[in-house]
Every structure is written in structure tokens, then in C-alpha cells.
Regions:
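Short, charged, surface-exposed hinge/linker loops at domain edges
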Residues: 1-13, 41-68
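A short, structured beta-strand/loop element
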Residues: 13-35
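Aromatic-residue detector
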Residues: 22, 36, 47-51
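Short, surface-exposed polybasic/aromatic micro-patch for ligand or macromolecular engagement
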Residues: 33-43
């Protein structure tokens, strides 16, 4: 089973990191890594939006295709 959520039109796979005792999300289909961590689902969406925004802004500044 794959745990996938959608944040602002982008899919991210979600897993539990037992060492950190946190949820970890990683966006799919992007040209670079954009991952995020949170202690709960609400925080995961909040951190995911922030991570995606930073990634997309950096791509725009550098003229890089974000891949999606």
C-alpha cells in the first residue's frame, strides 16, 4: 500500500520514520528533492506546502523546470 497525499496539485508519498517518530513526506515527479516532516497530519500538510513553495521558488529563480 502506498500512502499518497496531494498538496497544491502535487502528489507526495508519506511514511512514518520510527527513528524520528515523525511523519515524512516526499513529493513525487519533481526534478529535485523536496521532503518534509511533521508530528501529525495537519503539520504534514503545513510543512508540505512550505517545502513545495520553497522548492518551486528556487526553481523559478534558477530557471529550472520543477518537473511537474
Amino acid at each position: 500500500m502506498r500512502n499518497v497525499i496531494e498538496i497544491d496539485g502535487h502528489e507526495a508519498v508519506v511514511a512514518f520514520d520510527p527513528q524520528l517518530r515523525m511523519l515524512r513526506g516526499e513529493f513525487l515527479g519533481l526534478s529535485g528533492g523536496a521532503d518534509f516532516y511533521a508530528e501529525d497530519v495537519e503539520g504534514l500538510f503545513r510543512e508540505g506546502r512550505l517545502s513545495l513553495k520553497v522548492f518551486l521558488n528556487m526553481c523559478a529563480e534558477k530557471g529550472i523546470d520543477p518537473g511537474n
